[in-house]
Amino acid sequence: MSFLKKSLLLILFLGLVSLSVCKEEKRETEEENENEENHEEGSEMKRYMFHLMDGEAKKRDSEENEIEENHEEGSEMKRYAFGYPSGEAKKIKRVSEEENENEENHEEGSEMKRYAFGYPSGEAKKIKRESEEEKEIEENHEEGSEMKRYAFGYPSGEAKKIKRESEEENENEENHEEGSEMKRYAFGYPSGEAKKM
């Protein structure tokens, strides 16, 4: 029985608390509504005092907006007529300049990092890549030339080099023999021909 009484008292107490909370919320809501109504009445009085009726104020705002739009259209026409960039073009130009500046700063930062850690710069990589490409192109050209020579029966670069070296050796040998002949004649030694006789 005691338990039943305690639970009923607890329920009754909670009901009273919730009722008082609801009354407090209702009173606060009524006060807020009253304050809002007073504010609206005050605003209406101010508008009436300063001759700014709702319709008149809206009319003025629309006229001001129309004047501003006409001014912007006129400015746009002037820019177009005299070749000046519009606000949008200026914005695009400014954005591209900022992107270029950011890219330059990034490249400078990357260059500093490469320098600090001993990595080659983009320019060095580019030069290295170009030289490798040139070597590859030259090798491909040489291979193509070698195939053509083989196909058409022309001597290859190596064969030409060997032939040229043997011709140079023969020429050097002839020059040496002529020089030796001149020396022998100048100093009175018999030549190889004279020795044979």
Swiss-Prot record:
Source organism, top-level taxon: Eukaryota
InterPro entries for this protein: Frog_antimicrobial_propeptide (IPR004275)
Propeptide stretches in the record: 21-45, 56-77, 88-112, 123-147, 158-182, 193-197
GO biological process, one term: neuropeptide signaling pathway
Ranges of biased composition (kind: Acidic residues): 30-39, 167-176
A molecular function GO annotation: opioid peptide activity
Keywords (A to Z) from UniProt: Amidation, Amphibian defense peptide, Cleavage on pair of basic residues, D-amino acid, Endorphin, Opioid peptide, Repeat, Secreted, Signal
Residues modified as Aspartic acid 1-amide: 54
Residue numbers bearing the D-methionine modification: 49
Distribution of this protein across tissues and organs: Expressed by the skin glands.
Region (Disordered): 24-197
Pfam families found in the cross-reference section: FSAP_sig_propep
Family the UniProt entry places it in: Belongs to the frog skin active peptide (FSAP) family. Dermorphin subfamily.
Function: Dermorphin has a very potent opiate-like activity. It has high affinity and selectivity for mu-type opioid receptors. Deltorphin has a very potent opiate-like activity. It has high affinity and selectivity for delta-type opioid receptors.
Name of the protein in question: Dermorphin-1
Organism: Phyllomedusa sauvagei
Classification of source organism: Eukaryota, Metazoa, Chordata, Craniata, Vertebrata
